[in-house]
Amino acid sequence: MNRHEQRLKLMIAIYQYLLLHKDINEVAEDIKSDNEVINEYFYDVLATIYDHEEELIEKIDICLNDWDYDRLGYIEQAILLLGSVEILKMKYDKAIVIDEAVQLAKEYCDDETYKLINGVLDKL
């Protein structure tokens, strides 16, 4: 599974976590039960989001300007959490993370949402 596919699985896992209020370990097991190979990166990202969720949301909220994190859809929240944890906590290359997040937004969100995702992650 390449990194884009891993990020897609993570977006789905984070979405389930946010929407269904499931335990993060239960979400990981649900994804794993789909016969997918889940690697250390997957677990590291989920654990880091779980451990720093409030801090990440605060930083996202600051970058949203006239918007509020809670008003965003769960998919948008999931993409922003994924991107923010990779940029702020895991120190991945910001340009690559933003590009991947924009791709996910173009595939799974409303037409113009990718611009919001791009702008927020760029400000982090």
Regions found by a protein language model. Name each.
Residues M1-L124:
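N-terminal interaction/assembly modules
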